[in-house]
């Protein structure tokens, strides 16, 4: 247990150290340079794969577009989280009502179908 914790902690520390070293946590110019370097390194591999695929692969987004998309989806996530928190009492009330109704249905004795069609033959 302790060994597993130490291994996981070491992996997290190594990941943070490596990402700091390559510039992910640096200023925006450093991150832009890293993004463009990765993009240029992947370009030959992507071109080789494009020839083998039966469909066209879209281009990677530009840096400014990537920033916009990251901000947009982050903001959408925050808004949806707060919308869920705002609606939580309503959801909880509906859920509790549904549970109450279900237990009331279970508490009632089953209805016996009467009539000539349901009586056993003699």
UniProtKB/Swiss-Prot annotation:
Transmembrane segments: 9-25
UniProt record, GO biological process: cristae formation; regulation of cristae formation
Record keyword Metal-binding present: no
Keywords annotated in UniProt: Membrane, Mitochondrion, Mitochondrion inner membrane, Transmembrane, Transmembrane helix
Membrane topology: Single-pass membrane protein
Subcellular location(s) of the protein: Mitochondrion inner membrane
Subunit structure as annotated in this protein's UniProt entry: Component of the mitochondrial contact site and cristae organizing system (MICOS) complex.
Name used for this protein in its record: MICOS complex subunit MIC13 homolog QIL1
Organism: Drosophila melanogaster
């Amino acid at each position: 247990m302790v060994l597993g914790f130490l291994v996981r902690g070491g992996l997290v520390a190594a990941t943070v150290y490596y990402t700091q070293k390559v510039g992910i946590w640096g200023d925006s110019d450093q991150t832009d340079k890293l993004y463009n370097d990765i993009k240029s390194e992947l370009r030959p591999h992507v071109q080789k794969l494009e020839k083998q695929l039966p469909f066209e692969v879209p281009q990677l987004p530009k840096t400014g577009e990537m920033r916009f998309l990251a901000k947009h989806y982050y903001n959408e996530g925050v808004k949806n989280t707060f919308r869920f928190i705002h609606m939580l009492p309503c959801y909880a009330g509906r859920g509790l009502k549904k549970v109450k109704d279900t237990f009331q249905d279970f508490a009632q004795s089953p209805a016996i179908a009467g009539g000539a069609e349901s009586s056993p033959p003699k």
